[in-house]
Amino acid sequence: MNIKKIKKEDLSICLKIYKEGLNSGIASFQEPNITLDEFYEKVDLEKCLTLEVNNKIKGYAFFNKVSNRYVYNGVGEVSIYLSKEIIGKGYGKYLLTELVLLSEKLKFWSLHAMIFPYNLRSIKLHEKCGFKFLGIREKIGKMT
């Protein structure tokens, strides 16, 4: 297993993992037909890590600022996507832990994740990494 900063050439593999997550119905409100260019716009390479298993990218995680307002400069929203073949095998904890460490190096002081309430694996993963369940936001988005 290896965790490293993402490179632009990794994005096409990460996009496949992302679409796999979208097709699961529990990963995001995004539409599954996102293009590579749109994906590139979404992911800040400085704030993204990839997870390699047997020298192949099998997951990635990133965070973005939640707002451009000055008072929120150190607040980020986390996203993590794993290939279905490694879900439940403990890799996510290592990846998310490294992402939290990266966020601290970049002077972020608070991270949160927006997780569907029925994505229990993701909720448990985040709790193992120190995230706290704060509640359920209703009518925040709509599945297409």
Regions found by a protein language model. Name each.
Residues 103-115:
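Conserved GNAT acetyl-CoA-binding A-motif
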Residues 62, 112-115, 132-144:
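Conserved catalytic-core motifs of GNAT/GCN5-like acyltransferases
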Residues 16-33:
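Helix-loop element at the rim of GNAT/NAT acetyltransferase active sites that forms part
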Residues 18, 126, 131:
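Conserved active-site tyrosine of GNAT-family acetyltransferases
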Residues 88-101, 124-128:
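Conserved acetyl-CoA-binding loop-helix of GNAT-fold acetyltransferases
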Residues 1-16:
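A short beta-loop-alpha structural element at the N-terminal edge
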Residues 31-85, 96-97:
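Acetyl-CoA-dependent GNAT
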Residues 80-89, 101, 117-118:
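Active-site acidic-Proline motif in GNAT/NAT acetyltransferases
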